[in-house]
Amino acid sequence: MAKAGPGGPDRILGSLHAIPHEGRLTAADDLFRRMPAADVMRRYFAELLRLVEGSDLFQILAHLDFPRRMWPRAAGPYEEQAFETEYRAVLTALAAGDRILEVNTKSPLVSAGLLGWWREAGGRAVSFGSDAHQPWRVGDKFKLAVDVVEAAGFRPGRDRFDFWRR
């Protein structure tokens, strides 16, 4: 795995924002207009699994279910359980590489149940990210994200910069 260190970045995140479709990388919100929402999520998870298994350049996986942020209302409520197999495949591969799962505070969609899957897969730690894009938004909904992480059995690390561990 790539190492962060002196003079370089503290942490290296891996994330996926677009999905291959018809020979091009396509944003999930565009794909939601072209195909059933569940198909978009399954394609996303398949590509995310390829990223996790095929690259050791990152330490933390961000945006575990990024397209969920754009889930169309017409598709009904988003249910993590409908994609449990896909979540578990990604989480198992991530844990096998001794990596960290990010919990995003911008829109903390992750549940204690999903973090339970992370634990069951062998995941040992989580990181918080705000995905703020504006300085004044850093840490929005942090308390909510902490509550979810604690409910899943993760606790603060040695200092405020450390990962939360089980």
Roles of regions detected by a PLM:
Residues 1-95:
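Extended substrate/RNA-proximal surfaces in nucleic-acid metabolism proteins
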Residues 74-166:
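Charged catalytic cores and adjacent phosphate/nucleic-acid-binding surfaces used
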